A protein has these predicted regions:
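N-terminal accessory/cap region of cofactor-dependent oxidoreductases and related radical enzymes
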Residues: 1-135
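A general alpha-helix detector
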Residues: 83-87, 151-158
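Inter-helical turn/loop segments and adjacent helix faces that build the functional surface
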Residues: 90-97, 156-168
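Amphipathic alpha-helical scaffolding segments
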Residues: 104-107, 149-154, 173
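Alpha-helix capping and helix-loop boundary segments enriched in small/acidic/polar residues
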Residues: 118, 139-147, 161-168
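Short, conserved phosphate-binding/catalytic loop or strand-edge motifs used
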Residues: 124-131, 146-155
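Non-catalytic regulatory/linker segments of enzymes
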Residues: 132-137, 154, 160-162
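Conserved small/polar residues in nucleotide/adenosyl-binding loops
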Residues: 171-177
Length: 177
């Protein structure tokens, strides 16, 4: 309406963030995501969907929501798999150490965020994929990493203890798996 345009033009209020951005001011439960992976959420959603009584009208919206969640999980898995494939293709033309790095990247991207993270590198990659996808979906609007230090520390500590990471965050390629 014209009266709304007057307020927007004068700067009294704006709709920019509401017209072109998704939900905001949120932090993903990365601790849970890293522990169970998207596959954990997928199993739970499939169970909830299977338990719905579709003769109850209120459950139709739930069914549609669960179906959408499963589509998103599959899309995220496909997105990560594309990075895995690209790293694999790049490794074909790479030399020695770089080839090893690219093959490791390919392995990590084929695993997370769909499966739970089991190393510091996997945890970082999992968080990055989810954060990136949310940024793309919501136009980069008010997304927080939350307490990155708290949910990443167990993975850092474990890799430090295994010798996979040195104190200066130098990765060793010959550490025990």
């Amino acid at each position: 309406p014209e009266e709304v345009n007057v307020f927007m033009e004068t700067g009294f209020f704006g709709m920019e963030g509401k017209l072109n951005s998704g939900d905001a001011h949120l932090a993903v439960d990365y601790e849970q995501l890293l522990k169970i992976g998207l596959v954990g959420y997928e199993k739970r959603v499939r169970q909830l969907k299977a338990e719905l009584d579709l003769c109850v009208p209120e459950n139709i919206d739930k069914y549609v929501f669960y179906k959408a969640v499963l589509i998103v999980i599959e899309a995220v898995k496909t997105y990560a798999d594309r990075f895995s494939l690209l790293a694999q293709e790049m490794a074909e033309n790479a030399q020695s150490h770089r080839k090893d790095e690219l093959l490791e990247i390919s392995n990590i991207c084929s695993k997370v965020p769909y499966e739970p993270a089991s190393s510091f590198k996997e945890a970082i990659q999992s968080v990055w994929f989810i954060q990136l996808i949310l940024q793309i979906e919501s136009n980069g609007h008010s997304l927080s990493y939350g307490r990155f230090d708290q949910y990443m520390y167990p993975y850092l500590k474990a890799d430090l203890e295994k010798g996979v990471i040195m104190d200066c965050l130098l990765y060793t390629s010959d550490a025990a798996d």
